[in-house]
Amino acid sequence: MIQHPRIGIRPTIDGRRQGVRESLEVQTMNMAKSVADLISSTLKYPDGEPVECVISPSTIGRVPEAAASHELFKKSNVCATITVTPCWCYGSETMDMSPDIPHAIWGFNGTERPGAVYLAAVLASHAQKGIPAFGIYGRDVQEASDTDIPEDVKEKLLRYARAALATGLMRDTAYLSMGSVSMGIGGSIVNPDFFQEYLGMRNESVDMTEFTRRMDRGIYDPEEFERALKWVKENVKEGFDHNREDLVLSREEKDRQWEFVIKMFMIGRDLMVGNPRLAELGFEEEAVGHHALVAGFQGQRQWTDHFPNGDFMETFLNTQFDWNGIRKPFVFATENDSLNGVSMLFNYLLTNTPQIFADVRTYWSPEAVKRVTGHTLEGRAAAGFLHLINSGSCTLDGTGQATRDGKPIMKPFWELEESEVQAMLENTDFPPANREYFRGGGFSTRFLTKGDMPVTMVRLNLLKGVGPVLQIAEGYTLELPEDVHHTLDNRTDPGWPTTWFAPRLTGKGAFKSVYDVMNNWGANHGAITYGHIGADLITLASMLRIPVNMHNVPEEDIFRPKNWSLFGTEDLESADYRACQLLGPLHK
């Protein structure tokens, strides 16, 4: 069984015996235990289990103890370290020198012992050696006997741990391409060097004929298929057919296509993660899957011109339930856009919640909305908004029908209630696909995302000569008056899922206006997650050495390794680019 990645906690100490070290042992080890307790009681893995920490076998005062800690961590699948100390220690003798995992150091802010002095010294050693480390230093002085972790320190410890765990969860997994390049979209030109060097992932690929092979040869669970078909008939609403009359399929053909798309879902899932049931049926090779943490399906146009499209498959893979009940979502990209798939993956690993995949389709200015609908925008919509709409698929969690404290939310699967599942299904229908675009048919997903949800839109882009760059836009979903929504929505495809999004403006740069956000967006797709997680994304990007070219995160929330400040403190964007370029990818 594959172990969860763990956080290693390193209590470092003044190595002087005969009084000094002995007086600090209990306080130092208690710091380590309190950090481990904070992380394990607050953070969860994507499967809902508490995050595991490993504490060094002893306090670390000299090199042999640092080496013993390193050996333990290697055996324990430690993906990142947090060093803690209340006192002076010997900097380069006690530091962890692993170059391929993130490091953080918390130096206790107290007057009795110089924990802050050690913090500064060891961070200088990290900078000298080219091994980045995050520095954590509480704003307020604490008493030596105080065992509480200050709130500002907690925030940084948890931000670091969330991002560090994401690096560990990605390592040694795969991106699975189902098909190849869709309609010339750059993001679906999969770059294996990026996956290997920045994420520690490998790439796998299957031709889309693998779907028809498995259907024709019965390489799926027939019992599950019958159960799935019954569930779909009882729970999934077929929507209005918007096709012109000569393109409307017969009832018999639509029924056949429902069976087809259910099989597509089962096969897509089995390709990603395997299915032991297939081995029982005699298909041992297919049963193991591809160890894929994220995948994408090309679809257009070679598949969709002939077969039912992938919308149903993509929708339910990204959703946290199906006929087998509530479960964690898969991360699955439309049009095999691997870069949007990775954007979704970053969001998912930081939040444990499902992701909206959408076209960043239209900027609606207040003037244009007024001209088309007669409505004057106000509130969060006053400066205009973006129409986020995918061409037929989206996680049903994106409806916003789950709630917390009476407000719409996208929540982890272990919090999801059966009543919320039913609400998502009731507020979604599945119209026959637009056969002018999808000649082979299929069924799209249609819903409207509820308003007033805090969300973050993210996109990873590849820039020749630079490499990957990340852009982030925090904002809110909107609920427009019903007639306004219908007027605007019907100008695109009324059979597709819509989210109205207003980014938070800052008055400068790419966030001077909503138009500027649209104009500076790097690609046609975006990954949208619940919550304002821009600060976590910036921390994760710095660990992977991916510069951020556009964000609206308050400066006081930005948390990067300490040596980033040595590249400049006034122009943080420029310093980020220089640091990432000099240090290079995490796994190179």
Curated annotation (Swiss-Prot):
Protein keywords: Carbohydrate metabolism, Cytoplasm, Fucose metabolism, Isomerase, Manganese, Metal-binding
Pathways per UniProt: Carbohydrate degradation; L-fucose degradation; L-lactaldehyde and glycerone phosphate from L-fucose: step 1/3
Principal subcellular localisation of the protein: cytoplasm
Sequence positions that bind Mn(2+): E335, D359, H525
Recorded GO MF terms: arabinose isomerase activity; L-fucose isomerase activity; manganese ion binding
CDD domains per record: L-fucose_isomerase
Positions of transmembrane segments: none
Key word Transcription present: no
GO cellular component entries: cytoplasm
UniProt xrefs under Pfam families: Fucose_iso_C, Fucose_iso_N1, Fucose_iso_N2
Catalytic reaction(s) noted: L-fucose = L-fuculose
Obligatory cofactor(s): Mn(2+)
Protein EC: 5.3.1.25
Entry keyword annotation includes Manganese: yes
Compartments reported by the entry: Cytoplasm
GO biological process, one term: L-fucose catabolic process
InterPro entries for the chain: Fuc/Ara_isomerase_C (IPR004216), Fuc_iso_dom3_sf (IPR038393), Fuc_isomerase_C (IPR015888), Fucose_iso_dom1_sf (IPR038391), Fucose_iso_N1 (IPR012888), Fucose_isomerase (IPR005763), Fucose_isomerase_dom2_sf (IPR038392), Fucose_isomerase_N/cen_sf (IPR009015)
Catalytic machinery residues: E335, D359
Function: Converts the aldose L-fucose into the corresponding ketose L-fuculose.
Protein family per UniProt: Belongs to the L-fucose isomerase family.
Name of the protein described by the UniProt record: L-fucose isomerase
